[in-house]
Amino acid sequence: MQGEHGVQELRETDPRTIGPYQVLGRLGSGGMGEVYLAEARGGLRLAVKVVRAEHAEDRTFRARFRHEVRAAQTVGGAGTYTARVVDADTEAARPWMATEFVQGPNLRDAVLDRGPLPADTVRLLAAALAEALAAIHAKGLVHRDLKPSNILLAPDGPRVIDFGIVRALEGTALTRTGVVVGSVGYLSPEQIRNGAQVVPASDVFSLGAVLAYASGGREPFGEGQDSVVLLRILTGDVDLSAVPKEQLPLVEACLRDDPAARPTPAELVAAAGHSEASLREGLRPG
C-alpha cells in the first residue's frame, strides 16, 4: 500500500536504512515481506519491498527473485502505467527492490472509501491497465497477482505495482505443498488448476475481475473461505449484478474460461473506447 496518508511510524525492529536509502516509515506488509517509504539523497521517494527472512533462505526463491527483478527493471517509464523499478539488491541478507513512490490510494481503498467508480473513469482505468499489461507482457513477464490493492491511483493515471514478483514464491519450499500463490478472488481458472500454465491472458482474467470490482463495488466471486471462492472461479459462478450494463461486455469477455477466447490488451484499449492519444488526454492532470 502507498500514499502519504497510509504511512505508519517505524517500529523498533524496522531498519533505518536499506541500501543507500533512508527509511521514513512503513507502507504495509504482505506474504512477500514488508514495504517501506524511503528517500534517496537527492530527495527521490521510493517504495522499498524487503523480502521476509524465511523466503531469503530459500535458494529457489532467491534465483527466481533475481530473475524477476531483472526483468521488471526493463519495464516502466513514461506512458506504461507501471511503477518503475529504480534499484534492487537481490544478494542482500534480505533481498529488496525499490520502485518509484506513487502518491495516491490503491484502487481497493478508493472503492471502499467512495464506492464504485463512474463509468468514464472505469473506461479510462480499463484502457490504462491494458496498456500496463501490454508493457509487462512485452518483456516476457506475467503479473500473476493483479488485484485492486496492486493498482495505485495517481493524479496522472493508475500505476500497476508488483508485476511478476509473485512468481518468485511459486515452487519454493514454502509453497510446494500445492498452495496457490496470489489473491484468490482475482486468480484465473488456469492459475488454480495449474500455476505452471499461467499465460499473459491470465492477467486479462484478473483485469476483468478488477474492473467488475471498480464498477460494481463488490468482489465478483464473492467472499468467504478461499476454497469456496476458488470453486466459484472454476465453475464460473460470478456475480456481475452490480456492474453497469455498459461495462458488462468488456468484463464478461475478460472473464471467459478459455484463455484463448479472452481479448488481448490492445483489443481492450480499443474496446474501452480509447486510442493511445485519447487515453493520455483523458488522464491528463487537472
What is each model feature region?
Residues 1-285:
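Eukaryotic protein kinase
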